[in-house]
């Protein structure tokens, strides 16, 4: 019968092995026969080598060897060998327990060997659960406790000392708050403040409340300091709740009564609340405006206490530094509004600018680039570097700067359309004459305008001042009428009527001349005039080129002709049914010595003839060329 393992035995052959091997033992009972079919001989080896080797391994490093037990006898009973092995294992466990206990005691460096009594008790099984055993694991003990050392070494830094002192004080405060023993003795207490009560009539500042709050505030401050020193510090469980309920709060009252015309609410809130949000973001605090006028009527409901107070700002933050910074920002806005006029307040100007940008009505002139220099802050017409284009304009007639040739007020080099050179500067003389007339009408003496009169009429030769010393009006002064270039256009028919029988002062050519007008209205009188004055034909052809010189040399008196002319005009008017009273009035006025302008008219027509002759000579020269 071959040897099989216990798991392979079935049926009738399922019998227990004789001397089955156990953990910590050396074999089975050993009463079975030692015939063929027995297990290998190694199961019946004496247990002395194994027992002795395990005993040696279980001994501590500096402990004495265990004394021999009863199982180390020369008996070959397997049961005794198993009991001896179990006793050895129990002894090793006891040795480990003793070693752990001895390690907890300070100054112990050796381990005591177990006694025979301990070995015997463990062998009997009565000492297996003799005491509580510490549960060990690879992650450490189940209830590790970190204690504060009571001894301070010499090489400890100042930061470590602060951390140690703060931790000791925190433990002391926590113990007092848990036990309720936080009220000091009578000799150590300070005088009590006046009592305060809430809305229900309960006192809010009792001795217990005051000292508890004092300790809680101190603990919160110490925890904040400890967190700064040691980021790994774990604050107490109720720290966050206490700090949330004890956030520092301050009130800043607005000077509404002192400055009733200033809107502090708008200056603090800003457009759509952006100013208030900016201050909260900069300081890290929360700002709430409370009091009278802070809430519109019907928009919200305030507490009774807040409604009775003046308008103020409630500043709340996590720490005192944030509260102080926020209060400083609020005071800056108040001081600026109280000390600066409204038109010069940059804070309000920026708010209005921001509001316009939010509404989409901003005209950004400050950020707009100047088209002249490319800088910001001004427009092109306000540019300080703008080039003076007017100073670079040069007149090609007079050579002056700042005006064009068409706007030139100086004398021209040549006459327009062949005018004589002597007619240059008539424009200036005309302006001077008008100025002199204005001064004369204002009552200035003749001597004051003598220079102007001389400048106005001296060049042409006409008298600018009458015999009585008064200035001749411009409509009566022939020198004013004689403008340069007054004559026929190129290729036209020249004549005393000017521009092809469409003459007249300041005539643009769209009205008939004097002769044509007289022919159309008074044909009978015109024929009579032609018969009476054959030598002075107003519709005569163009004079010879030398006519101008002859006219200048001759000084004929045309007073008789003018008298006959006026008589013929009066007769013609009477023949056509004119009013006899008007004719009589005219005759009476002439008889009474009315002012006679015959010489002025004579001079006027003389100049017209000279101008016409000059134009005719220029035209003839151009035709021959």
Curated annotation (Swiss-Prot):
Q: What cellular-component terms does GO give this entry?
A: commitment complex; cytosol; nucleus; U2-type prespliceosome
GO MF assignments: mRNA binding; zinc ion binding
Instruction: Please report which protein family the annotation says this sequence is part of.
Output: Belongs to the BBP/SF1 family.
PROSITE patterns documented for this protein: KH_TYPE_1, ZF_CCHC
SMART domains, per this entry? KH, ZnF_C2HC
Q: Which InterPro entries match?
A: BBP-like, KH_1_KHDC4/BBP-like, KH_dom, KH_dom_type_1_sf, SF1-HH, SF1-HH_sf, Znf_CCHC, Znf_CCHC_sf
* Ranges for region Disordered: 1-154, 177-206, 466-533
* ZnF endpoints (CCHC-type): 368-385, 393-410
Give the matching CDD domains.
Answer: KH-I_BBP
- What species does this protein belong to? Mycosarcoma maydis (Corn smut fungus)
Q: What does this protein do?
A: Necessary for the splicing of pre-mRNA. Has a role in the recognition of the branch site (5'-UACUAAC-3'), the pyrimidine tract and the 3'-splice site at the 3'-end of introns.
Identification of the protein by name: Branchpoint-bridging protein
The entry's localization annotation reads: Nucleus
């Amino acid at each position: 019968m071959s040897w099989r393992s216990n798991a392979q035995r079935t049926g009738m052959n399922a019998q227990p092995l004789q001397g089955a091997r156990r953990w910590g033992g050396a074999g089975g009972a050993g009463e079975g026969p030692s015939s063929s079919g027995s297990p290998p001989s190694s199961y019946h080896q004496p247990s002395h080598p194994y027992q002795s080797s395990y005993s040696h391994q279980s001994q501590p490093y500096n402990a004495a060897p265990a004394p021999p037990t009863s199982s180390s006898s020369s008996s070959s009973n397997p049961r005794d060998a198993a009991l001896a092995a179990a006793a050895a294992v129990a002894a090793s466990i006891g040795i480990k327990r003793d070693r752990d206990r001895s390690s907890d005691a300070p100054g112990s460096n050796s381990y005591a060997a177990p006694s025979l009594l301990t070995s015997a008790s463990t062998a009997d099984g009565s000492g297996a659960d003799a005491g509580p055993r510490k549960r060990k694991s690879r992650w450490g003990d189940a209830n590790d406790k970190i204690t504060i050392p009571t001894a301070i070494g010499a090489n400890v830094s100042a930061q470590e000392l602060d951390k140690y002192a703060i931790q000791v004080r925190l433990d002391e405060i926590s113990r007092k708050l848990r036990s309720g023993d936080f009220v000091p003795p009578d000799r150590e207490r300070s005088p009590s403040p006046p009592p305060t009560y809430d809305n229900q009539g309960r006192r809010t500042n009792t001795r217990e409340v005051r000292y508890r709050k004092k300790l809680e505030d101190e603990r919160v401050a110490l925890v904040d300091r400890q967190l700064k020193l040691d980021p790994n510090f774990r604050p107490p469980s109720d720290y966050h709740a206490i700090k949330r309920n004890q956030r520092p709060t301050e009130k800043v009252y607005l000077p509404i009564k002192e400055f009733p015309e200033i809107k502090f609410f708008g200056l603090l809130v800003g457009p759509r609340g952006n100013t208030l949000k900016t201050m909260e973001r900069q300081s890290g605090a929360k700002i709430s405006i409370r009091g009278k006028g802070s809430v519109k009527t019907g928009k919200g409901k305030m507490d009774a206490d807040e409604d009775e107070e003046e308008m103020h700002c409630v500043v709340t933050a996590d720490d005192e530094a944030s509260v102080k910074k926020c209060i400083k920002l609020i005071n800056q806005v108040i001081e600026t509004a109280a000390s600066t006029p409204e038109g010069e307040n940059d804070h309000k100007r920026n708010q209005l600018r921001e509001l316009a940008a939010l509404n989409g009505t901003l005209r950004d002139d400050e950020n707009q680039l100047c088209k002249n220099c490319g800088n910001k802050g001004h427009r092109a017409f306000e540019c300080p570097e703008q080039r003076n284009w007017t100073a670079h304009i040069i007149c090609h007639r007079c050579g002056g700067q700042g005006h064009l040739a068409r706007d030139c007020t100086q004398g021209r080099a040549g006459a327009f359309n062949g005018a004589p050179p002597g007619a240059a500067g008539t424009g200036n003389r005309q302006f001077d004459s008008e100025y002199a007339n204005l001064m004369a009408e204002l009552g200035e003496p003749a001597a004051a305008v003598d220079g102007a009169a001389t400048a106005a009429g001296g060049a042409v030769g006409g008298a600018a001042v009458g015999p009585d010393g008064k200035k001749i009006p411009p409509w009566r002064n022939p020198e004013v009428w004689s403008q340069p270039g007054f004559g026929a256009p190129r290729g036209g028919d020249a004549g005393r009527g000017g521009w092809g029988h469409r003459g007249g002062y300041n005539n643009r050519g769209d009205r008939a001349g004097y002769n044509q007008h007289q022919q159309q209205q008074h044909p009978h009188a015109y024929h009579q005039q032609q018969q009476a004055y054959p030598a002075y034909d107003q519709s005569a052809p163009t004079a010879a080129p030398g006519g101008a010189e002859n006219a200048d040399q001759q000084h004929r008196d045309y007073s008789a002709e003018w008298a006959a002319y006026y008589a013929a005009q009066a007769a013609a008017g009477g023949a056509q049914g004119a009013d006899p009273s008007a004719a009589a009035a005219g005759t009476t006025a002439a008889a009474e010595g009315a002012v006679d302008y015959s010489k002025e008219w004579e001079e006027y027509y003389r100049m017209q003839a000279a101008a016409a002759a000059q134009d005719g000579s220029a035209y003839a020269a151009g035709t021959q060329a």
